[in-house]
Amino acid sequence: MCRCSADSSPVDVKDILNRLKSLSAAEEFFEALGGPYDPKVLDVSRLHIMKRMGQYLAAEDFSHLPDRVIAARARAILERAYCDFATSAPLSHRVFKVLKDHNPNRPVTPGRTVVPLDSFLKPFEKK
């Protein structure tokens, strides 16, 4: 596990939601909220973790809450999203639409044909 803040200083909770909105890298979220993470898990599942965190945050009502409570809830949500993917493969959760729409157990829809890429390349091969 990686401790995001090497000096383990307290998390700055002032205006935390607006600060989180300005972040882009997953590591920045863990650093801002003071949460630990395993870089190996983050390397594989960062987009899934961030998407799931967004889903969890969207379900929360932070209006009229003090910044300290918002920061604590946001950290708990980040840790929950992280744990979702730390113990299982990202594909098993299907957080993205393309994964939700694709069921590997469902046969290909009749009438849809898969054309191998090799069939396109053959006319361009040197003889």
UniProtKB/Swiss-Prot annotation:
InterPro entries: NifW
Keywords per UniProt: Nitrogen fixation
Gene Ontology biological process terms, A to Z: nitrogen fixation
Keyword NADP: no
Subunit structure: Homotrimer; associates with NifD.
Family designation: Belongs to the NifW family.
Function: May protect the nitrogenase Fe-Mo protein from oxidative damage.
Protein name (Swiss-Prot/TrEMBL): Nitrogenase-stabilizing/protective protein NifW
High-level lineage: Bacteria, Pseudomonadati, Pseudomonadota, Alphaproteobacteria, Hyphomicrobiales
